[in-house]
């Protein structure tokens, strides 16, 4: 049985968290800007990173630190990306060293992340000086996870925090996560930080496999604005304190773990898509009847990434032609004359296109459907049985305002 629970990254046994203001965000002393997540014991660890060729300094450091598949803690700051700036890797290593000193572990056992403005030298001194207070603030509580979630926010308007509980090998296993992401989010990961914790016992090899299988069908299926960031990191720590037999191969226990991990990451991905900068609507695009899953995914990603489709949803305009247009330039091979399109929400479900041709439909009802916060675009391709769901958001005037003065 899989259940959603409270606790975020502190839901699993043996994890503590904290988030405080140290001064990275010089313009907002009331905003937390450094987070720390610590396990009481060493963890199996894995991470996936941005596919952008331009990578932030912490990513290079993390790849080296995670080469052995182990970690003890995560330190992350907001307000500065530590990307394309002098002494980037040196400063990232200094953050790791400061955290390691407080915790009592090796710097190589620390994962480091940053998010914020690109191209400015990070003030690592205020982070180093703030780590003792950050460490002292560590707790295993809902409030501590909440503080860490707030400390990694940039243009986010709400925290992203989820936890789940399941059974693996007869033992209760918990996992939780916090994430940030509101702009520069696009399939294949984009300005998104996501930190996951679990007390499941699982080998480094299998947790890496599970993370890769999960990211592909969750975070890589969201889009806010089509920009892929320099800093994306999704990292998972597993400390084994649940007491289950260590998962070392695929089987029933692995399947149970994977199901929970996917549920956790799907919920976090949806929260990020819904909190797109200035967004008023969460758009869920489900493609069914595709020849294969790759085709379904290509089409769904194209639709949620379409600026014109986003604008239509913002205006509650049932311009289904923009959906077909986005499908057509997606690169997927399909027959447009087999395509059906519906719009749906809590207000109802209405067919607007059948076999590639427009239908007469109730404009007033459609307007009502598209005015709801959660809007679905349902596409049937009529060529097979494969399906895929992707998530995005509308684009509003506020998106321009937020990004027009981001550095201020």
What are these regions (language model features)?
Residues 1-90, 94, 100-408:
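A structural signal for small-residue-enriched, beta-sheet-centric alpha/beta enzyme cores
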């Amino acid at each position: 049985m899989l259940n959603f629970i409270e606790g975020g990254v502190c839901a699993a046994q043996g994890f503590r968290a904290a988030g405080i203001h140290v001064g990275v965000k010089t313009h907002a002393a009331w905003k937390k800007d450094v987070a720390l997540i610590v396990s009481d014991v060493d963890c199996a660890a894995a991470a996936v990173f941005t596919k952008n060729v331009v990578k932030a300094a912490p990513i290079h450091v993390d790849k080296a630190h995670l080469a052995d598949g182990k970690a003890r803690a995560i330190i992350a700051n907001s307000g500065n990306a530590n990307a394309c700036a002098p002494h980037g890797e040196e400063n990232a290593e200094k953050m790791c060293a400061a955290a390691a000193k407080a915790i009592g572990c090796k710097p190589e056992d620390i994962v480091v992340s940053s998010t914020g403005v690109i191209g400015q030298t990070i003030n690592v001194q205020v982070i180093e000086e703030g780590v003792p207070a950050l460490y002292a603030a560590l707790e295993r509580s809902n409030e501590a996870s909440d503080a860490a979630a707030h400390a990694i926010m940039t243009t986010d308007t709400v925290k992203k925090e989820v936890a789940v509980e399941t059974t693996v090998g007869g033992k209760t296993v918990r996992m939780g996560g916090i994430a940030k992401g509101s702009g520069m989010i696009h399939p294949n990961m984009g300005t998104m930080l996501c930190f996951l914790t679990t007390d499941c016992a699982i080998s480094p090899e299998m947790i890496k496999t599970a993370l890769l299988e999960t990211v592909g069908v969750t975070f890589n299926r969201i889009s806010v604005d089509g920009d892929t960031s320099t800093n994306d990191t999704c990292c998972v720590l597993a400390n084994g304190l649940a007491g289950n037999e260590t998962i070392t191969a695929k089987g029933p226990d692995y399947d149970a773990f994977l199901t929970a991990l996917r549920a956790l990451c799907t919920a976090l991905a949806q929260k990020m898509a819904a909190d797109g900068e200035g967004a008023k609507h969460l758009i869920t695009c489900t493609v069914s009847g595709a020849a294969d899953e790759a085709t379904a995914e290509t089409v769904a990603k194209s639709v949620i990434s379409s600026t014109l489709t986003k604008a239509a949803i913002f205006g509650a305009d049932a311009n289904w032609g923009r959906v077909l247009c986005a499908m057509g330039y997606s690169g997927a091979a399909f027959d447009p004359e087999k395509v059906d399109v519906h719009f749906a929400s809590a207000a109802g479900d209405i067919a607007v296109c059948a076999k590639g041709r427009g239908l007469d439909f109730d404009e007033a009802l459609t307007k009502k459907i598209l005015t709801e916060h959660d809007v679905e675009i349902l596409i049937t391709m009529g060529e097979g049985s494969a399906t895929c769901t992707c998530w995005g958001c509308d684009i509003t005037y506020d998106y321009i305002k937020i990004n027009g003065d981001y550095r201020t």
